[in-house]
Regions:
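Gly/Gly-Pro- and Ser/Thr-rich, intrinsically disordered tail segments characteristic of DNA damage-repair
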Residues: 9-176
Length: 176
């Protein structure tokens, strides 16, 4: 389920993402006084296996089975957009042709993407984020950067906010 795969990272500053982070900070700190040293608290949210996780919420019969979202399973062409962890452990990779994925994992279940549904869930995630900050930088429909610098005094430190968001997402989505 999505609930097990939501990941919120506290103060993510990996080398390859530093340019994105610096651009974001520059864009969102112009109103700060020059020379003011403000410690930023930025969270990175990534709902892993997002499309597959959403599909599993609507199809509990897929639980415990390898699942991939992508292409057109009826026409048997296209690529894997995402796969659940079971499929990934079998060697299925994002971007792999559907026929190759089926060779690697013969029991793989394919479903066609339903972007309207994934965007709905993405919007639900952002609604939760917006209760902690209005500084949300989306990165695709399953990832976002959240600047919670101003929220820390009200909601706790960055780690506490990340854990609370993660708990809320899990709780809310279990109810669907």
């Amino acid at each position: 389920m999505v609930l097990k795969s939501i990941k919120i990272t506290y103060l993510l500053l990996y080398k390859d993402l530093k340019a994105i982070y610096n651009t974001y900070i520059e864009k969102n700190t112009r109103s700060k006084k020059r020379g003011e040293n403000v410690e930023r608290v930025v969270l990175h949210s990534d709902a892993n296996c997002f499309y597959a996780s959403v599909e599993m919420l609507y199809h509990p019969e897929y639980a415990g089975k390898p699942l991939a979202v992508g292409g057109d399973p009826e026409a048997r062409h296209g690529i894997v957009l995402t796969a659940n962890y079971i499929a990934k452990r079998s060697g299925v990779k994002t971007g792999m042709a559907l026929w190759q994925a089926k060779q690697v994992c013969p029991e793989l279940i394919f479903v066609s993407p339903r972007m309207d549904l994934y965007l709905k869930f993405s919007s639900m995630l952002r609604e939760i984020y917006s209760e902690y900050t209005n500084q949300i930088e989306p990165y695709g429909c399953d990832e976002a950067w959240l600047d919670v610098t101003g929220s820390s005094s009200l909601k706790g430190n960055g780690r506490m906010i990340a854990e609370e968001i993660s708990r809320r997402v899990k709780k809310n989505w279990e109810l669907l």
